[in-house]
Amino acid sequence: MLEALLRQHDKVEQDWAEKDVPKLVDQLLDNYARFGGMDHLEGRDLPSKKVVTEVLEDLFSILFPGYLGDSEITKANIKYHLGLKLTSVYSRLTIEVEKSLKYICRKMECPQDICQKRAHVVVKELLEALPEIRSGLSGDISAAYSGDPAAVSNEEVILSYPCVLAITTYRIAHELYTRGVPVIPRIMTEHMHSLTGIDIHPGAKIGRNFFIDHGTGVVIGETAEIGDNVKLYQGVTLGALSFPKDEKGNIIKGRKRHPTIGNNVVIYSGATLLGGETIIGDNVIIGGNVWVTSSVPAGTRITIAAPEQHYKMENNIEKK
């Protein structure tokens, strides 16, 4: 009985492979032809998301040796570890950056070696910026530790706080973004968005000592500017008020669409700040669930009135 079932299964599998698979292949090819923009069958290779995320993990291990990464780091082997990781990141990331640059140049008659040379320069500059990036991250971690009464130590912050991963990724991706590298910065930040729930566009400009408490649902748009010593809580949106369109109805890109936040600002959970002309002055406190679409002077505290609540008791008597 068992042998008969196995033979029947093998026959069904063979029939499917010989008859149905070719039909399915033809259907998919027809679908590719009718619905463009979802395949990349012609032209140069696109950067590999897998390689980019692996490189990002290696950069974490360089910035936080002994904390993030799968290697056991000691003072005895740290020099070897850094040399190995830097060399590996340089070679792999250069290939991916070159692909991303060629992706932009595919419709232009660029000399073949320009993208390759530019990729080497960009990755070299990123790696040389790591000491400065790390100095900035030190302030971000200190801001998290001092700004959260539940934080026990810097070690706990580095190992467990999602904002550390999100902000670190942003600061790496921002270096590539400002050097004109397409695709890869978004791969990095969207990868971390999927892991942490914190969405920071690599084009945003963020100052020192930045802290996102809890983090889930935070959105920071491409043209947002954030000063020093700023603290955001979960669910804060720094977004666009509207999207101006051209005469054909297409969204006009490249304009400032997101708010500017001054120094020493605290924005509590659920607050929404919209618009490129919205400027929040220094030392402002914005309460939870506040909706802001215009500029706020320095030193202002904004809150919304508490909603009226009604309680119905067991004796059906309503109490306000």
Language-model regions, residue ranges each:
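Terminal amphipathic alpha-helical/low-complexity segments used for targeting or macromolecular assembly
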Residues: M1-I187, E318-K320
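Structural signal for interior beta-strand "rungs" in well-ordered beta-sheet cores
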Residues: H193-E314
